[in-house]
């Protein structure tokens, strides 16, 4: 098969979205209510990693970057994730806190996109979550200088074993370079696939202490 033939096959990959629509009359006033419902349904459907979300940031040149992290908490203040503070995403957030989140629940023919500003979590919040993690995950946080170049995986594995020995007694201390961010919710868009590509999209936009809801064309 030629590269062109393979490209033509990709171009024709498509399917109809038939799992149901989203109507204005069914929308709650608070988008968190709908988000919680959809997340619960994603969990009930046993999707792989239902809390996985794409975090998009931009560097000082305006170049976008994306990566998948796990949502660890959400409430009216925002959506929370944890990371190495020396990572590329953390540095980019420090210089430009505007980020976008995307929950790609493909199996349910749904997406949720959140845009807002990211801010660092308090040390108290970080410590509480860090010590709730499995012990090996706590040690793993010490191992990697995230986004730095390394010559082989063996370097990480050797470092892990070294630190596991070092921290075998007592609590694993919180690394100074490990923390988290809370992304405020300025806009939340809910997307539900529809037949004939007539998808349903609703945008919640914060206006003072309330939410304005608009239907968007697909």
From Swiss-Prot:
Assembly and interaction partners: Homodimer.
Entry note: cofactor:
Binds 1 FMN per subunit.
Sorted alphabetically, which HAMAP family does this protein's record hold?
Answer: PdxH
Gene Ontology terms: biological process: pyridoxine biosynthetic process
* Cofactor section: FMN
Q: What is this protein called?
A: Pyridoxine/pyridoxamine 5'-phosphate oxidase
**PANTHER family (alphabetical):** PYRIDOXINE-5'-PHOSPHATE OXIDASE, PYRIDOXINE-5-PHOSPHATE OXIDASE
What metabolic or biological pathway is this protein involved in?
Answer: Cofactor metabolism; pyridoxal 5'-phosphate salvage; pyridoxal 5'-phosphate from pyridoxamine 5'-phosphate: step 1/1; Cofactor metabolism; pyridoxal 5'-phosphate salvage; pyridoxal 5'-phosphate from pyridoxine 5'-phosphate: step 1/1
* Chain sites annotated for binding FMN: 67-72, 82-83, 88-89, 111, 146-147, 191, 201
* Species in which this protein is naturally found: Escherichia fergusonii (strain ATCC 35469 / DSM 13698 / CCUG 18766 / IAM 14443 / JCM 21226 / LMG 7866 / NBRC 102419 / NCTC 12128 / CDC 0568-73)
Tell me which residues bind substrate: 14-17, 72, 129, 133, 137, 197-199
Instruction: Name the UniProt key words of this record, in alphabetical order.
Output: Flavoprotein, FMN, Oxidoreductase, Pyridoxine biosynthesis
């Amino acid at each position: 098969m030629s590269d062109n033939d393979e490209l033509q096959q990709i171009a024709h990959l498509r399917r109809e979205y038939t799992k149901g629509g989203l109507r204005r009359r069914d929308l709650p006033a608070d988008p968190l209510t709908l988000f919680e419902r959809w997340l619960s349904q994603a969990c009930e459907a046993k999707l792989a990693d239902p809390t996985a979300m794409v975090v998009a940031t931009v560097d000082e040149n305006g170049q976008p970057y994306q990566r998948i992290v796990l949502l660890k908490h959400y409430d009216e203040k925002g959506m929370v994730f944890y990371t190495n503070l020396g990572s590329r995403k953390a540095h980019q957030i420090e210089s430009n806190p505007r980020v976008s989140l995307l929950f790609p629940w493909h199996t349910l023919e749904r997406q949720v996109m959140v845009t807002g500003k990211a801010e660092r979590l308090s040390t108290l919040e970080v410590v509480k979550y860090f010590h709730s993690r499995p012990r090996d995950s706590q040690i793993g946080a010490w191992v990697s200088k995230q986004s730095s170049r390394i010559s082989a995986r063996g370097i990480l594995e050797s470092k892990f074993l070294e630190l596991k020995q070092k921290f075998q007694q007592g609590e694993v201390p919180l690394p100074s370079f490990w923390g988290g961010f809370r992304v405020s919710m300025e806009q939340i868009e809910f997307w539900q696939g529809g037949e004939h590509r007539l998808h349903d999209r609703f945008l919640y936009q914060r206006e003072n202490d309330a939410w304005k809801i608009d239907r968007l064309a697909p």
